[in-house]
């Protein structure tokens, strides 16, 4: 389930969705790509089974991300590929894999990507998610008040629980033309 919708900024009620899913025995993966760099996430309080995010969404490198998973679920999952560091012991008769997370880390890891991701997370932590969230909220209010007088402008994504994302359409204008104009200016 998506924590925060990228196009509208809607903050989905993941805590309630997780509780309902768990009531039926369904594990839940939370896509936190849009929420991780903007709002604090307590995976244990949410009772999320898995949480994922992309490195580039937290101002880090592309091609790397993170997966949180409950230990018992990760231990129950088989490795999906083979390679050096993930193997505890190998004989002609059998292969014994290391425990999680090592059993999912075949071959040479993306060391440069991991260092870059760590630096990006350190930066976010140094600025502070509350400060980032407050600044983004101020920018959203400023933009909305500045655009309020544009004839035919209609905001999209006005959920009560919402991140600082502003989507809109302008009556009589092609969306791509508006986006192209804004991109140039």
Segment roles from a protein language model:
Residues 1-185:
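Pyridoxal 5′-phosphate
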């Amino acid at each position: 389930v998506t924590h925060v919708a990228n196009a509208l900024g809607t903050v989905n009620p993941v805590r309630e969705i997780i509780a309902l899913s768990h009531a039926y025995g369904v594990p839940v993966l939370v896509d936190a790509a849009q929420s991780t760099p903007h709002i604090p996430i307590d995976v244990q309080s949410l009772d999320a089974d898995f949480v994922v995010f992309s490195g580039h969404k937290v101002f880090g490198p592309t091609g790397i991300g993170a997966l949180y998973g409950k230990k018992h679920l990760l231990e129950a999952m088989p490795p999906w590929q083979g390679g050096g560091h993930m193997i505890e012991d190998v004989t002609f008769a059998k292969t014994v894999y290391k425990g999680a997370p090592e059993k999912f880390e075949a071959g040479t890891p993306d060391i440069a990507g991991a260092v870059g991701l760590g630096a990006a997370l350190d930066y976010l932590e140094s600025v502070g998610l509350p400060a980032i969230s407050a600044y983004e909220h101020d920018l959203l209010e400023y933009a909305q008040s500045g655009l309020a007088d544009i004839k035919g402008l209609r905001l999209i994504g006005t959920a009560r629980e919402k991140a600082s994302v502003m989507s809109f359409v302008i009556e009589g204008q092609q969306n791509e033309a508006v986006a192209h104009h804004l991109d140039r200016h």
